[in-house]
Amino acid sequence: MIKKIFLGTLLTGLILSGIYLNNLGQRPDREYPSFTLHPETKATTVHDSIPLQDVVLAGNNWDGVITIFDPNTFKIIKKVSAMPDREERFEEIYSGLRSLASGFIREYIGEGNDQLVDDMFTSNDGRYIYVSRPSFADVVAIDVNSGEIVWRTPIEGLRSDHSAISPDGKTFLVSASTARKVQAIDVSTGEIIGSFESGDQPHENIYSEDGKKIYHASIGKVFFASPNLDFLKGDRWFQIVDANTYEVIRRVDMKQKLEEAGFDWIDRAVRPMAITKDEKFAYLQISLFHGFFEYDIENDKITRKLDLPIPKTNKNLTPGDHILASGHHGISLSGDDKTICIAGTMDGYIAIVDRETFKYSIIKLSDDPKEAKPYWATSSKDGTKAYVSISGLDKVSVVDYVTAKVVAEVPVGNHPQRVRNGQLRLKY
C-alpha cells in the first residue's frame, strides 16, 4: 500500500511538473502596440540642418515601447517600438529548450511579462536609439525616424540588462545577465569589441565623468530571496573597471565593508548607485534595504547609512515579498551633487535627501505602498530635476530637487523602468 501511494504521488508530481514546464515554455497570447515603419525617412535622409533637440526617453519594459518627451514642456513628442522584429524574436525565444529559459525570465524576473526594453541611449548624431532588450538577449540600433533596426547584436547568455554609453558616445556597455560578464559594443558597427568579468547576474554600469572608469555591480540570483539561501545567490561584487583596457581595478565584497563599518545587513548586492562627479563617494542601494549607504571610494570604506521610513503596512515584509530582492531601486544625484533622489520601490514614495545632513522629504505616490512601484531615478540634463519612473502607474514623475515637489507627470507605457536624457534629430 505504501509503495502504491509513493508511486502515485511520484507520478502525480511528474505529471504536474510536465504541465508546469509546458505552460512555462509557451508564448503568452498577448497583443503589443503596433507601429508603421517609414523607410522613406531613414537616417540617410535626415540632413544635419535638422537641429538636435533635447529629449527624455522612457523605456516601457512590458510593452516594448520607448516614449520620447520634451524636457521643458513634458509633452510627449513621439513613441518608438523597440521591437519591430518582434514576431521573429518571439518565435526564436519560444522554440526548443530556449523556451523554458524564456518562460523563467518572464515569470520570475518579468513578473509574468516578457522583458522587451530595459535600457536605451541616443546616438551622437541623434539618428538612432541603442536599446538593450532582456528577453531577446540582444542590443539593437533603431532608426528613430524610420523605426527600422539598423544593426542587431546578440549578447552572450540568455538575457541582456542594464547598460551605459561612454561619454564620447562610441561604446555601449551591456550586462550579460547569465554570462557573468559585461560586453562592450562599437555603436558604429554593432560589433562586440571587449568585455570584462563580473559576478552572478551583472547589473548596473556607470561611466565616470571623464570616461576613464566604469563602476559596475553584480546582484546575484535575486530569485533566491531568503538570507538562508545566501549560498545559492552567487558572487555579488562592486567593481571599478578601466574603461580602455576593461581590466578590473578594484573588486569589493560590500558585505565585508558593511561589517567593517558596524552595519550588519542580510545581503551584499549593490543595486542602483550614484557616483559624485569627483568620484570620491558612491551612494549605494543594497538588496532588501530600505535606504542607502555612503561608500568612500578613495578610502574603500562605508561611512554612513540612511534608513528611510517603511510604511506600517510594510513592517512585516519578508525577503520573499520584495520585488527581485529590491527594497529601494533607483537613485540619482542633483547636478551640484548636493541632493539625492530615491525611488522607494517597495514603499510607494520618492525621497529627496540632503546629501550633507541626510535630512529628507517624502513624496507619497499611492495609498497602497506596493501600487506605485517607483523603479528608477535619473537627473535632468541641467541637474535641477529628477525623473522617476513610476512603473506600477505607467508614468514618469518629474521632481524639483530644491522644493522636493512633483512639478509634472508624464503618462508613458506599460511598466516604465530606465529613463535617460538624450538628443535626437526628428523629421516631422
Question: For each predicted feature, which ranges?
Answer:
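N-terminal Sec-pathway targeting helices
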Residues: 1-10
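Predominantly soluble domains enriched in secretory-pathway, periplasmic, or organellar proteins
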Residues: 13-428
